[in-house]
Amino acid sequence: MTRLTVEDLNQADKERFVDAVGDVYEESPWVAKRTWSEQPFSSIDGLQQAMANTVQDASQQKQLELLRAHPDLGERTEMTDESQEEQASAGLDRLPPAQYETFQTLNDTYRDKFGFPFIMAVKDESVGTIQQAMEDRIDHSRSKEFQTALNEVNVIAALRLEELTVPRDGTQEQHA
C-alpha cells in the first residue's frame, strides 16, 4: 500500500478522507468526519492534533462511546485488524491460561469500576508492563482515568496514522 501524504489528505473530499483515516480511532469514523472540515493541515502531526481536538471537544457521551468501542486487552474475541496487530505485538494473543485469567479479572474489575475497557497503547509493550499499568490505574478516580483513557486513545490513533502516512523523512515505503 502506498502511504498517504498530508497533501493527499488535504485534497481529499470528505468521503475519501474518512475512507483513508476513519479507522485510526477504533470503530469511530465520526472523528475523521468532524475533523475533515479543519483542512488544510500543515502536517500529519497537525492532522493528528486536529483529530485529538475533535475528541476533546466532543460531548462526554460521545467520548464514552469512543472508549467503549475498544476491546478488552487480551480478549479472544472479534476485534479490528488494527487492534489484533497491536495486541499481538505485545504478546496479548499468546497469554498462558493463568495470565489470561488474570487479565480477564483485571479487565472485569476495571470495566465494572469505570464503565469502559482498560485502554493503553500496547504496541510493542511487554505483557508485564501492561499488567502493571492495569493494576496501577484501577486505583485512579473515574475522572482521572477517563482522561487517561482518552489520552491513550489519542496515542493509539497517532500510531495508526503514522502507519498510514509518509514518514517524516518523506520516503514512500511500500507495505504489503
Swiss-Prot record:
Protein keywords: Decarboxylase, Lyase, Oxidoreductase, Plasmid, Purine metabolism
Pathway noted in the entry: Purine metabolism; urate degradation; (S)-allantoin from urate: step 3/3
Pfam family, one: OHCU_decarbox
GO MF term set: 2-oxo-4-hydroxy-4-carboxy-5-ureidoimidazoline decarboxylase activity; oxidoreductase activity
Broad class of enzyme this protein falls into: lyase
GO terms under biological process: allantoin metabolic process; purine nucleobase metabolic process; urate catabolic process
Catalytic activities: 5-hydroxy-2-oxo-4-ureido-2,5-dihydro-1H-imidazole-5-carboxylate + H(+) = (S)-allantoin + CO2
Known EC number: 4.1.1.97
Ligand binding (substrate): 71, 83-87, 118-122
Region (Disordered): 72-96
Gene3D superfamilies: Oxo-4-hydroxy-4-carboxy-5-ureidoimidazoline decarboxylase (1.10.3330.10)
Active site as annotated: 70 (proton donor)
Annotated function: Catalyzes the stereoselective decarboxylation of 2-oxo-4-hydroxy-4-carboxy-5-ureidoimidazoline (OHCU) to (S)-allantoin.
Family under the similarity heading: Belongs to the OHCU decarboxylase family.
Protein name per the record: 2-oxo-4-hydroxy-4-carboxy-5-ureidoimidazoline decarboxylase
